[in-house]
Amino acid sequence: MSGVVKRATRVAERLREDLSNLLRDLRDPRIAGVLVSRVEITDDLQSAKVHVRHEFGAEDAAARRALLKGLEAASGRLRRDVARTMGLRVVPTLRFFYDEGPDAERRIEELLREIKDGSSGERS
C-alpha cells in the first residue's frame, strides 16, 4: 500500500470519528440519532463520501431525505469544525449518502423470523 493511500485511509478513519462526535453536538432534529458508518476519501483528500444511517433505522424514503437534507445544511459548519479538530490544510468536501445495509439486514432478519414462526405454526 502506498504512502498516499495509507494517509487517505488514516484521514478517512479520523474523519469518521470526528464527524461522529461533531454530529452529536448539532441541534437539528432532522439529524438526531445519525451514525456515521464509514467514510471514503479520495487520495488527494479533496472529497469525502460520508455514509450515514439512523440509529433506529429509517424505513421510509422521506425520513432518509430529511436526514440527508439536514446533513447537507450542516456541512459547512462540519467542515469548519473538522478543519479545527484535524488541522488539515485541505478539508475535503463532504457528500452524504444513506447506508441502507443495516436497515436491509434488519428487514431480512424480520422476514426470516416471520417465515420461521409461520412454519412452526403449521406443524402444530
Swiss-Prot record:
Record keyword RNA-binding present? no
InterPro entries noted in UniProt: KH_dom-like_a/b (IPR015946), RbfA (IPR000238), RbfA_dom_sf (IPR023799), Ribosome-bd_factorA_CS (IPR020053)
Q: Where in the cell is it found?
A: Cytoplasm
GO CC aspect terms: cytosol
* Keyword list, A-Z: Cytoplasm, Ribosome biogenesis
Recorded GO molecular functions are: ribosomal small subunit binding
Gene Ontology biological-process annotations:
maturation of SSU-rRNA
* Family stated for the protein in its record: Belongs to the RbfA family.
Reported function: One of several proteins that assist in the late maturation steps of the functional core of the 30S ribosomal subunit. Associates with free 30S ribosomal subunits (but not with 30S subunits that are part of 70S ribosomes or polysomes). Required for efficient processing of 16S rRNA. May interact with the 5'-terminal helix region of 16S rRNA.
Q: How does it assemble?
A: Monomer. Binds 30S ribosomal subunits, but not 50S ribosomal subunits or 70S ribosomes.
For this entry, the protein name equals Ribosome-binding factor A
> What is the native source organism of this protein?
Sorangium cellulosum (strain So ce56)
Coding gene?
A: rbfA
